[in-house]
Regions:
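Non-catalytic interaction surface on structured domains
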Residues: 25-28, 46, 72
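Structural micro-motif
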Residues: 49-58, 68
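Local sequence-structure signature of Cys/Sec-based thiol-disulfide redox active-site neighborhoods
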Residues: 1-28
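Residues that form or flank phosphate/diphosphate-binding pockets in enzymes
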Residues: 16, 39, 65
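Thioredoxin-like thiol-disulfide oxidoreductase module
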Residues: 34-52, 78-83
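Non-catalytic, surface beta->alpha helical segment in thiol-disulfide oxidoreductase systems
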Residues: 59-84
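C-terminal alpha-helical interaction module
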Residues: 1-8, 45-48, 68, 83-85
Length: 85
């Protein structure tokens, strides 16, 4: 099973949507709270090539992007392949 990490903020609707998709699929993930100014936020930006919006999603260490990119992967069928790896 793939290792999933999601950098999030409490009030973020896109974060909730991304987490909901993984929960609907029965896939476990690690949530990393990354409020503005936190070390976790800086880590998310570093790992994602400078992106500062939330969520930032990683599957097996590979940067996937945010919620829009996750939903695009789901729609194309590629998410299932990434999760099966």
């Amino acid at each position: 099973m793939a290792k999933i990490e999601i950098y999030t903020q409490d009030w973020c609707g896109y974060c909730a949507r991304a987490k909901s998709l993984f929960e609907q699929k029965g896939v476990a993930y690690t949530e990393i709270e990354a409020p503005h100014g936190s070390p976790a936020r800086a880590e998310a930006a570093r790992r994602s090539g400078g992106r500062t919006t939330m969520p930032q999603i990683f599957i097996d260490g590979r940067h996937i992007g945010g919620c829009d990119e996750l939903l695009a992967l789901e729609g194309s069928g590629q998410l299932a392949m990434l999760l099966a790896a």
